């Protein structure tokens, strides 16, 4: 729709949906008799994206197919093809098992909890979070390093179930179909290979405490959290159908895997072992349950995690893609922040390569990318709101290296430029 203001010779165009004029928006798109602004287009895209989450291709039992789960994982997580395939199949089978639980009683299908093994910043946590988003089930994350046996200072393992209950708005039925991700699981390994007479309350003790809730038990949870009191009423949560995903970096596990089967010998006649020059992620692909036992996990705990998915180190190319391609890519996030100041942010390709190399040098993986970008853009984000005529900021390789400041491209902002109209 278009309106004419007073006796103006030039008509002012308005968005047919929100009513904003062409002076208030960046772009108007013209149809046969209507106009739509860029802000409304963006809002429509958000609505479509939300609806597409609930329109996943379902198999006959109402569970998303492994290929569909994998496709959505690809939107958020770059690389890690093997881990995505393992997770897609395991999660599909888990929820298919729940869908058929009451139909066939002749065969009891066991739960398949998942162990994610991969270097720091390789995407373990993001994979678990994305799975919960795809399946629209309650999700909670726990840090294994804060857990202790019941009766000791620290978090009880039952607090994990309480967090899941809170994530489901205290809907017990939904919580019982949720996903729990326990991070830093390698930090609760037994302190030595041999059982000790001293109590290991944050290592083996936590593994023992986790066994029952991972296997399936009815946990008594205080409805509003806090410590248990005798007069307090408890919510009963059955953990049998909760999917547990445990993840850890397992620093040092690659040495255990490499040494397996080689044997040891000493003396002048000893054979010289060539060092394993494979990357950590490649070595992890050969992991066996016996390696996890040597690392310090108890046999019963390893047995509760039958599905092993390993993640690889992220190389420079993968880190560059992570910066640019996912829906929540860091470059897109910062570009949106700059757009709010009506400034276009541009990264040169070589600059992104240098950012990726810095993350590899720091051994922080994808997790370290944000802090690197934050450091690069700090001064610019500090100065920009006070500058009048900046239209574009360009980040080159010299900026990443700290040798120069970003390039500011100025324009004439004295004139209020109306939104451009596309037919």
UniProtKB/Swiss-Prot annotation:
Molecular-function annotations in GO: ATP binding; ATP hydrolysis activity; ATP-dependent protein folding chaperone; protein dimerization activity; unfolded protein binding; zinc ion binding
InterPro entries in alphabetical order: AAA+_ATPase, ATP-dep_Clp_protease_ClpX, ATPase_AAA_core, Clp_ATPase_C, Clp_protease_ATP-bd_su_ClpX, ClpX_bact, P-loop_NTPase, Znf_CppX_C4
GO cellular component: HslUV protease complex
GO BP annotation list: cell division; proteolysis involved in protein catabolic process
Superkingdom, taxonomy of origin: Bacteria
Binding site for Zn(2+): 15, 18, 37, 40
Signal sequence, start to end: none
Binding locations of ATP: 119-126
ClpX-type ZB domain mapped to chain residues: 3-56
PROSITE patterns: CLPX_ZB
Keywords carried by this UniProt record: ATP-binding, Chaperone, Metal-binding, Nucleotide-binding, Zinc
Subunit annotation: Component of the ClpX-ClpP complex. Forms a hexameric ring that, in the presence of ATP, binds to fourteen ClpP subunits assembled into a disk-like structure with a central cavity, resembling the structure of eukaryotic proteasomes.
Function: ATP-dependent specificity component of the Clp protease. It directs the protease to specific substrates. Can perform chaperone functions in the absence of ClpP.
Annotated family: Belongs to the ClpX chaperone family.
Protein name according to UniProt: ATP-dependent Clp protease ATP-binding subunit ClpX
Gene: clpX
